[in-house]
Amino acid sequence: VTGAAGLDAALAAIAAGRMAVIAGDRLRGGDIDLMIAAEAVTPEAINFMATHGRGLICLSVTPERAAQLGLTLVNPGTERQTGRPFARSIEAAHGVSTGISAADRAHTVRVAIAPGASNADIHSPGHVFPLIAQSGGVLTRASACEASIDLARLAGAGDAAVICSIMRDDGEMARLEDIGDLIAAHGLAVAEIGELIARLERADA
């Protein structure tokens, strides 16, 4: 299910702490991502992304959260073209072992989004890759980073999200038509960025 119904289903899933698919990233040639609200992240969710997404697992944060953590863009000026506004990779300062396990990465996410978190709570480099979103969300930049935060907010699930690009079995980036079996097997709802933009524009009108 796509379109408005898909967006509604995705918002319901996110509100319930489940995963959804983001489609239609305009800055990355239509790449698609798995997404879960950061406040709902678990080791099982990280493992699902690593197993079925196979791309880089990233933490989408607002500029305000990034500033709170002392994070800045690694390569300012390129993020508008790439749709991947990377800050330096992070690890929780305490409570992890090697940092790369699903449990360790989930812990790092929880530490980074805690209300009182600061730069003292994280170390770099690490195994979680923060993305710093544009303040205006998808109305400013139509990428999965901004979409994931907008979706979390609309779902009442905070203002941070974990996303992971989906690769095909042959290593190429997947398109929506490539993951029908994955969507069906796991009951994943699809939020299209174009539909999200249209809804937010109507809300602003």
Q: Positions of the model-derived regions?
A:
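Catalytic domains of riboflavin
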Residues: V1-A205
